[in-house]
């Protein structure tokens, strides 16, 4: 069988372009500049490159809101600006339609005679949730007659500063006081929002939320968080603190549990424990029969009502490629596998005809990826090189820049970028050998800003632009324009000679001629 001449999209996750430049790279922890990346340097010196907007209104988020992996891959695959759940919920709270939502009305009606548990990430990170959504939900619940409202607050420290949690907890305490709601639990997202089946972490969160196990606190939730900081703990890793109904079954039969995160991937494992009687990830000890509600669709198979149903996207990139009879491959390690499949395919689990997938396991032997910043980049590259000649188009992701960027350890970030650079070289050389073409970009920034001005770690995403690099033998005959992530799918289609559908509002950024 003859080899294909593949078109390849390489997503260097979390690899943005810091506008402050190399002169302040050390001060701001720009791992992408501080790293020794000879191949990336070679590409930028010898191939057309431009910049893409990957945050705010460019990707369907509020102005100034940092981008994230879910949003980035949705826009990359859809070829249009996809308005995000963050904005949809914001608008529903502002215009009052949230209070008229039928799913919420039913949930609040049941909770009026039992207990309402609100579970989710408490920050303004806007990646998985937003504190304003929680405050709005509490208000609407109170107005619907719910009087026993327990908040199980998951602290962030990843999509915002590692010690910003105390401020959010204080803000929440003040905001919900008029409605009699109480913060019953505080626990870090490391435990409550694992997505890699490290069930021992979820067990700690479950025991706290359901059984009231953890540090029994007589102080306020904000004071507890401050005490954790004094012991060297940061928001992501806070052990459970219990502030109401301690050491008893707090989630009971007929209670309502509402997970208010709008992003699905890190909400599924705890949801599985609540929803499935046969769940065996860890010993739950008790399995309360609750009315479980999710803000958005976490899994199409879940037997639970959804407050905001998913908007369906038609004629996305994978669909167009499939309908043209072309073959496609999606490849990433575990941490970003959902992004090149579920999110790139419009937020649905559909695997198109002609679409194959390769999942490379992420390292399980380390708790955080600063301890192994290379992650599985080399293995992803090896699998890619072995498979690429069989496909018309490949979508691949290197997770390192984002996953290690979230740790805030600059030296680890440097090693992560170097690992990606080395793996990228192997992939690019193989594609060029086959006569193929590549677009190299990112879904959002992160690794280019790992240190704050005061020297503290910056673990959050950024609002920076991301590179777009065109790599092909005809590099001297094309011009590459600036754009946004939604322009990538139309560009890929043009490189494949496929017609762009009307639903795609993006534009091809590759034009013939210099």
UniProtKB/Swiss-Prot annotation:
Active site: 69
GO cellular component: cytosol
Binding site for substrate: 128, 158-159, 189, 195, 263-266, 336
Functional note: Catalyzes the interconversion of 2-phosphoglycerate and 3-phosphoglycerate.
Assigned protein family: Belongs to the BPG-independent phosphoglycerate mutase family.
Gene: gpmI
Keyword Manganese: yes
Pathway noted in the entry: Carbohydrate degradation; glycolysis; pyruvate from D-glyceraldehyde 3-phosphate: step 3/5
Keyword Manganese tagged: yes
MF GO annotations: manganese ion binding; phosphoglycerate mutase activity
Pfam assignment, any one: iPGM_N
Binding site for Mn(2+) 2: 13, 69, 443-444
Annotated protein name in UniProt: 2,3-bisphosphoglycerate-independent phosphoglycerate mutase
Binding site for Mn(2+) 1: 402, 406, 461
Catalytic activity: (2R)-2-phosphoglycerate = (2R)-3-phosphoglycerate
UniProt remark on cofactor binding: Binds 2 manganese ions per subunit.
The enzyme's E.C. designation: 5.4.2.12
